[in-house]
Structure formats: structure tokens, C-alpha cells
Amino acid sequence: MAKITTRAENYSEWYNQLVQQAEMAENSSVRGCMVIKPYGFAIWENIKDVLDKMFKNTWHQNAAFPLLIPKSFFTKEASHVAWFAKECAVVTHYRLKNDPDWKWIIVDPEAKLEEELIVRPTSETIIWDSYKRWINSYRDLPILVNQWANVMRWEMRTRIFLRTAEFFWQEWHTAHATAEEANEEALKMLDVYGDFAENFLAMSPVVGRKPAHDRFAGALETYAIEPMMQDFKALQAGTSHFLGQNFGKAFDVQFTNQNNELEYVRWTSRWVSTRLIGWLIMSHSDDNWLVLPPLLAPYHVVIVPIFKTQEDLDDIMNYLRPLFEKMDNASLDAHSKYIKDSIKVKYKIDSDTQKTPGRKFSEYEMKWIPLRVTVWKRDLENWQVEVFNRITEEKTMMKLDDLVGNLENILLKQQNDLYEKNKAFREANTYYVDTYDEFKDKIERWFIFAHWDGTAETAEKIQEETKATIRCIPNEWFVKQNDEWVDMISWKESKWRVLFAKSY
């Protein structure tokens, strides 16, 4: 495979080439939309499988709502829609027809819709239309619903996985009787995202809440996880919102409480998307090939027999049959408080006669399969195989009977090593400053913790002058308020340090 551009040479081109050579995705014939190839989609399926188990273990249920939403629904919550109104795709007609000369297909002007439909940019409005029918009493609450869906936002600047017109995501929309219960739900599910980030994505993000001026439209609180990419930028990888009664009032969703009084329902929402795949690529990969946390890799092990004749291959496959039987029952225990099930070890056998061993090795190193097991016929009598560890790049000879027993330790050590490396990278590139001159000097390649006076005006001034934004108020700083702290620009009182960074 061709050598890829290094991160130092051109970070953006490095990312694009890695996505292409690892056969994860490509641009499609539809502007801004991507084709997710089987290898890339397998990663999304693994993300989805893990998160879905987490959701169900926290008593959430899946549902499906329409892709097309009446435009009038969006007028009920105008402030919410303002965030993405310019990105909405609109359906105006319901039929095509042949032109009079039968040379082309045209839109039938007589098939104009009475009301235009919006291709789902997010589902709050259509879901709350259903909730109005579902909720009458406090006994109907809480509703804990998640949807796996595709979404359309007509992005002008697109980049595979990170920003595309169409993408896949999950969206939670929960309804509650009290504000306390709703906010507790928002925080609990942020913890689910944080657990997933650390234990499966092998990431060490900063966790906190957004400042008031940067909350999700209509939210009373927005919580977020913010990891650092290898180019020192932040990427908002997950958010959780407590929205109070705003949507309950907009859609007139009321319930009778325990005192037989009418109240508006409280609401929370949150989502993550295929953007996570871009996050994984940029967080762990190096200048040579893709690097993935083993727990989310499409395959954990690839087994490559080395043979000259069909007879050699048959002998090797017979030799390996006991291994296959054990591998079929092998599993990995994730250290997550939200996952009860083990993850089944996934393996692949490559006996393709059209590719040389060298080409196979190169392909699996680029795509990053954590362990490669190579089997020569000469090793049959010693009952051993060669194991290549993709993280350490070390080759060891291992007895066949010992291989499956060692798999879990090797793979989970790889997982933990990636997490510790990511955590060390973020901590080594995080700086605490007290003056604006120092801030401007460091912000290009650091996460910066600095005091802020709490005003949108100061945040906007910093963004205009440095392109850095407040990513979040970290949880540990939110509880460390001190009247003696001052903002680095205005010299007004500052209650806490906040995280500043440049971002995607």
C-alpha cells in the first residue's frame, strides 16, 4: 500500500488518506453524503451494539419515528429550529413523471404537497407530537425512548465522518414529571457516554457543562464530553441536555400530577453519531496506519495460513480446527458498570490464494486488526503459531493450547495501553494560565484552563481574537467556586476555570 502523508506534513490529508486506504468510507455521487464501506460500517455496528446494551441496561427502549416531519411542527419551537434551519432539506412534491418528449424525468407540478415536509434534521418535534398522545398522567412517566436513525443536515463544508450532509446517530428523548428527575437523567446518561468513551473508545475526555451562551437551543443545562485530537483541537463527542418544560409547553404536553393538578412535562435529550468514527481515527491512529481500540475493532484476530499447495492448506486447517472451536466460544469482559455481557471475540481466517502473505500482512496492519496469527506447516509438529501484536509490533511463538487463554489479557492490555496513551497525551498538552498574553501564546496547541467572568461578551471577544471557544466548565471546577478568582481579560470576578480550545 502507498505511504500516507504524515500528521505533521498535513493533518487533514493524513486523515483523508487513512480513511481511504483503510477502506472505511468514500464520498458518494450525492453532494456531502458518504458511502460507509463494510469495514467502516462494522465499526459503527460495534459502537451501536455496545451503546444499545448500555441504553437497555439503564431501562431505555428503542422506537422509530418518521423520517419526514411537517414544516408546521418546527414553528412550534422556533428557537430550537434556528440552530439548523439553513441546513434543512425540504420535500415539496410527492411524484415524478416523464416529460412530454419522454426524454427525461421531471417533477410533476400537480403533485405539490399541501404542506412541505422536512427531512429529519433531528426528531424532537415529531417525537413530542407522539408524546402528547402518550402522556396523560404522572403514571405514564417517565418515558425513556431512544431512536437509531439517519439524519439529514445540508452541510456546506463536508468531511467524511466528521461532518456530512447525511449521517447515522442515536437520539434519546425522555419525558419526566419533575425537574430533579429530568436533570438527574441528563447527568446519568452523560455518565454513560463517559463510561463508553473511557472503556470502549479508550479516550480520556474532559467532562463538564456548557456555558449558558453555548447551550443547546432551549436547554436549561447542556453537558458535554470533550476529547483532544492529535492536532490539539477539541471535538464535541457527546452531549446531554436538560430542557425543562420548553418542549412540553411548545407542544402542549401536560400531565395530571399526584395532586391532581396539570403540569407541563420536563424533557431531556442527547445523541452521538458516526462522527465518533472520525474521532477514533484522529485520536489513536499514527503516521503508518489505522489504530483502533480492540473492543470496537471489526475483528480481534486474523489467522493467516502460509501454504504452497492445497494439501498444505488442508493440513493447516485440520491442525487449527481445535483452535477454531475454542475461538468460537472466546469472549472479552469490558470493565464497564453499564455492560453486563461479554464481547464475543471476532476472528477471520484468510486463506485467499490470490494475495501474497506480504500483501495480507500489509492490509491487516493498515486496517488494524489487533492480533495476527501466522501458521506455517513447519510449526505443525511443534503445535505452535506465531502471534504478532499490532500495538507492540512484537512477534512471539505461542503454543496453540495457550493462545485462546491469553487472548483476553493481550487484547485488554492493548485497550488499556491506548487509553493511558490518550490520557497522557491530553494531560501533557493541557496548560493552566492566568494572563491573556500567556493564553494567546499557548492556545494554538494546548487545552487551556483559564478563569472566565461568565459573560458571553468576554467569550465572544476571545473567540474573535484567537478562534478558541469555551468547550465546557469541567465538573471538578464547577464545584470549586472562589470569590477571589478574576477573569484574565475583564478582571471581573471569575467563579471557575473553564476549558478553552480550538475545535472542529
Regions found by a protein language model. Name each.
Residues 1-504:
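NTP/phosphate- and nucleic-acid-binding module
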